[in-house]
Amino acid sequence: MAAITAAMVKELREKTAAGMMDCKKALQECDGDEAKAVDWLRQKGLSKAAKKADRATSEGLIGSYIHSNGKIGVMVELKCETDFVARNEQFIELAKNLAMQIAATNPVAVDENGVDAELIERERAVYREKALAEGKPENIVEKIVDGAIKKYYKEVCLLEQPFIRDDKKVIRDLLNDTIATLGENITVGRFCRFQLGA
């Protein structure tokens, strides 16, 4: 087992914003491997996010973004539990990043639940016809369609999209990381995207 130094703990803490004891435990669990410790903390953070998911989010703010060309604008409702967190710089930055994401990618809904069922059925029919036209066997067409629908959700659902500033993360990860850091449930209420001439 590698010796865990105060410098290692400090460095991990600066990278993750996790508590000092959590960083020390993560390094101990991962035998001093910083990359694995970051993953360990993220997994712990995700479980924190899951525990907080049932809490009411009645505070928050409206984040906005106007593209530099002045032709695209976005408003996004970001909700949290307390006004203290709503005024936090990291929360405000998250709202700004979400608004920029929406401006760039034009999602249809926050998550899968917000996508119109008729739209999904139309997409399913298109993918099914395409697979059959390509001569795919009937028994694997449904698997192909399911895979195509999952890919479609990643394109049209905000929480499933790759983050425009770091495509190794999806927006859900960004949200969960902020929940873990701030210690409160955070949800995206709704959003509105305007585009001149659209």
Curated annotation (Swiss-Prot):
Region (Involved in Mg(2+) ion dislocation from EF-Tu), start-end ranges: 82-85
Keywords: Cytoplasm, Elongation factor, Protein biosynthesis
Gene3D superfamilies found in the cross-reference section: 1.10.286.20, DNA helicase RuvA subunit, C-terminal domain, Elongation factor Ts, dimerisation domain
GO cellular component assignments: cytoplasm
Protein family membership: Belongs to the EF-Ts family.
GO molecular function terms noted in the UniProt entry: translation elongation factor activity
Subcellular localization(s) per the UniProt record: Cytoplasm
Function in brief: Associates with the EF-Tu.GDP complex and induces the exchange of GDP to GTP. It remains bound to the aminoacyl-tRNA.EF-Tu.GTP complex up to the GTP hydrolysis stage on the ribosome.
Name under which the protein is recorded: Elongation factor Ts
Alphabetized InterPro entries for the sequence: EF-Ts_dimer_sf, Transl_elong_EFTs/EF1B, Transl_elong_EFTs/EF1B_dimer, Transl_elong_Ts_CS, UBA-like_sf
Classification lineage: Bacteria, Pseudomonadati, Thermodesulfobacteriota, Desulfovibrionia, Desulfovibrionales
